[in-house]
Amino acid sequence: MKKLLSIVLSIIIFIGAFALPSLAQENELTYKERIYTAISNMETLIDLRDYKVKVDDAFTYLEYLFYQQPELYYWDILIEECTQNSNGELVKLAFTYDRTKEQMLIERMFIENQTNKVIEKIDKNWSDTEKALYIHDWLSVNFMYDYDLFEEPGTENHDILNFLKDKRGVCESYANTYMYILRRIGINSYLVVSEEDNHGWNVVQIDGKWYHVDVTNDDPILSVEGQPPYHYDYVGEVEHEKFLLSDSEIIEDDSHDNFFIPGVEGIVCESYTGNDSWRTATTAVHKIGEYWYYLDNSKDAGGLMRTKDFENTERIMEIGYYYESWGFYGWLKDDGTIQGNYYAGLFEYNGHLFFNTEKEIYVYDSHHNIFKTVPIDRPQGKYYYGLNMDGKTITYLASADDLLHNVVEGEYVLGVDIKHLSTDWEIIKNPTETEDGEKVKFCYYCADIVERQTIPALSSVVLGDANGDRDINTTDLAVLKLYLAGINKEIGIGADMDRDGAINTKDLATLKLKLAGF
C-alpha cells in the first residue's frame, strides 16, 4: 500500500484580502471540479481565489483524489506552491508532474485500450452483480500478484498504468484497476485501506447497496514456506470468497483489520442476499447465449456447470474425483493419489469454452452441445496443473508431482499448432427468390469459418437438381438417396423439391414422380 498522503510544499505564502478580479462569476464549477479538471489536464497553476475554500478542505479533497481517482496516477501530490489569504482561504496551487502532458495522453489511451478488452465483452443487459463478477474474474485470471515487487519497497506497481503494462502488481494495483473499470461502466467503487495489514481492496455499490470486494485475495498464489515458488500464480484459477461481503464478513480473516475509506465516510457494507452459486466457482465465469459457465469442485457440483440465474445450476460434465474425506473434487493420478483441487482454467473464444482436466484439454461447443478433446500432446507422465488462454494461444502447466516440482510449460496456437477440423455445412443465410444465401463450415476447435459457399437464389434453382449440374435425371435421384442414407453429405439445394427448408423422403417421392413424367 501507499503510505498516507505526503504533500510536499516548497512555499506557503499569505496575502492580504485585497480586491481581485472575479473569476467565479464566469466559472460555475465548484472548487472540487476545478481542481480535478486542472490535474486531469496537467495544469501547473490553479487560481482558486474566488472559490473561498479553506486550505484544510482543499487538502482533504486532494487526499481524496490521491486515493480514489486512479486515472490521476501520474500525479504524486507534489505541490510546488500553496498560497492562502488572511482568512485561511486558498488562493492558488502550483503543481509539478513527473512527465509531459503528451506522454500522459499516450498513456491514457493505452489504459483505455487495455481496459476496453474486458469492457467490450460486457453485455449492457447484464446485472451489475454480473458485470462486477466478470471484471473481478478477468483481473484474477489475466494478472498476478508479485511478491518480488512487494518485498522490494519502491518497486511496487501501485498504479493502473504499470499494472496493465506488466500484468503484475500488488493489492493496490488490483484495487485501482478494478475501481477504474467499474466506474467506466457506471458502477461506483472506492479504495479501502487497512494500514494495520498494509492492504487495500474495494467497496462496490450494487443496486444501491455497498459490498466489499478483494480481487487480490481472490487471485490465488502459490506460497509454500521454505520453498521457492516455480510460478506465483495458480494459472487460470479464481476464487470468489472475497466477492460481495459485508463489513463483518470481510474482517473474519487477518488481513482486513481496522479498515477505512480515504476521503469517504458513511459507507456501510451489508451481506449479499442475491443468487450466488458463483461463490464455489474455481474458475472465471463466462456467458454464452443464455447460460453462465464455470468449473466448480464443491461437493454438490463437481464439474463444468451452467446456470441462467446463479441459483439453479446444471452439471454438464463431471470432472475429477470426489474425495469423501475432503468433501470436494480433485485430480486423480494413475497411481491412485489425489490432488485436492481443480488445477484448471476456463476460457471462452468465439463462443467455445476451453478447459482442462488432469489429463485432457477440452473444447465445448455450447451451440451444438459437443465436447471434443483438443489435440495437444500432454508431456509423458505429467498431469495438467493450470490453463491460460490469450486469443488463440493456449498455455498450460504440467507436472508429474505438483506445482513446486518438475513443472513444464507448453504453448499451442489454434489454427497453427492445432489444425482446423471442419464441421458439416451449416446454412447461415437462407436464400430468397432474389437473393443468394450462404453456407459455411466452422472449425470444431476455434469456431473460425474455414470454408464458405454461396447458395443460389431460389429463382435460379432448378428443382430436382441434386448434384448442381442444372440437369434433372436419374443421377440426381441416386445422389438424393445416398444423402438420405447418410452416405453422401453433399446435396444441392435443388433437392428440396417442396422448398420447405428440409430435404427428406417427401422430396425423394416428388423427384421420382417428376422423373416419371407426373
Stretches with model-predicted labels:
Residues 418-460:
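Extracellular modular ligand-binding repeats in secreted and cell-surface proteins
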Residues 293-296, 355-356, 395-398:
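Residue position within the beta-strands of beta-propeller blades
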Residues 9, 13-17, 182:
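Hydrophobic core
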Residues 275-287, 322-348, 378-391:
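Repeated scaffold domains used in trafficking and secretory/extracellular systems
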Residues 4-5, 18-117, 306-309, 318-321, ...:
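Linear, non-domain "peripheral" regions
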Residues 19-23, 458-518:
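Cellulosome-associated attachment modules in secreted, modular CAZymes
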Residues 173-244:
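Hydrophobic/aromatic-rich core segments of domains that either
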Residues 100-163:
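Secondary-structure boundary elements
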